[in-house]
């Protein structure tokens, strides 16, 4: 169903020890994915967020990142379009913790970034599936429904625990650009939370690198070029420039959750610019 991306320092992961380690990560990720799928289903059915499961997944992802001598970023590869919210949420959580650690965050701050990344799209459980997987453009009515997911996500998170203020704010703000564009629109100009600006970078990068019903995946290089081009308007340079540097410092390897053999990645076909949600 899925694949992963492991980012290392350029050395080949061809030893038996490395293969065993990456296979262990793959099996762990399968458990994490199943937990997230269950969590989304539980929220959809009951309206209640199982916080313990969310925190457990974030801790598991953090452990997977540090399971070898170099930091590994286990990013899931989408196979079926209706799995997008699950795989994307996992990837954004990993990327948010990775750039946070790269910038010197630690401990609770990193866990908050991980939980914020994991829950940033939680409001999509309220969006009809036919809209989420629709090929082609949205109608005005469909886009209005899609644009409600930040508010829905923030409400679901705050209803669970008011102490989840940062993840709730990130869920609300993650589609707002540095220049104030995006959605939901503010009634007056103000800065977004720093965690929202950090997650926004991770969110757009992973969305661009993922096949969607309405466009093919971009290569990592093309997505990073887009982040650089939009830095200062869409993206905060405090986070986008270190993110670009971090991703360029590491080479990409692919491995399948069904088959732990490490395989070189192949370029993805480019698509149109930007992402709709």
Language model regions located:
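All-alpha helical catalytic cores of prenyl diphosphate-utilizing isoprenoid enzymes
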Residues: 61-66, 83-91, 122
């Amino acid at each position: 169903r899925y694949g992963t991306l492991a980012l290392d320092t350029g050395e080949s992961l061809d030893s038996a020890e490395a293969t065993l380690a990456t296979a262990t990560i793959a099996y762990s990720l399968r458990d994490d994915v199943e937990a997230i799928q269950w969590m989304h289903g539980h929220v959809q059915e009951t309206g209640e967020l199982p916080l313990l499961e969310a925190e457990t997944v974030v801790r598991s992802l953090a452990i997977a990142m540090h399971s070898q001598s170099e930091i590994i970023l286990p990013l899931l590869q989408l196979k079926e379009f209706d799995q997008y919210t699950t795989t994307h949420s996992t990837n954004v959580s990993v990327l948010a913790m990775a750039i946070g650690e790269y910038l010197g965050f630690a401990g609770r701050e990193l866990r908050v970034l991980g939980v914020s990344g994991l829950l940033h799209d939680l409001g999509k459980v309220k969006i009809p599936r036919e809209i989420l997987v629709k090929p082609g453009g949205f109608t005005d009515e469909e886009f209005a429904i899609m644009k409600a997911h930040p508010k829905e996500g923030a409400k679901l998170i705050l209803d669970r625990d008011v102490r989840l203020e940062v993840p709730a704010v990130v869920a609300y703000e993650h589609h707002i650009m540095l220049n104030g564009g995006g959605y939901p629109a503010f009634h007056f100009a103000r800065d977004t939370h720093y965690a929202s600006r950090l997650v926004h970078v991770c969110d757009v990068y992973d969305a661009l690198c993922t096949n969607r019903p309405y466009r093919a995946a971009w290569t990592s290089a093309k997505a990073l070029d887009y982040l650089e081009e939009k830095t200062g308007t869409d993206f905060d340079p405090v986070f986008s420039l270190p993110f670009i540097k971090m991703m360029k410092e590491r080479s990409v390897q692919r491995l399948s959750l069904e088959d732990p053999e490490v395989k070189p990645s192949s370029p993805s076909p480019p698509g149109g610019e930007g992402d709709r949600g």
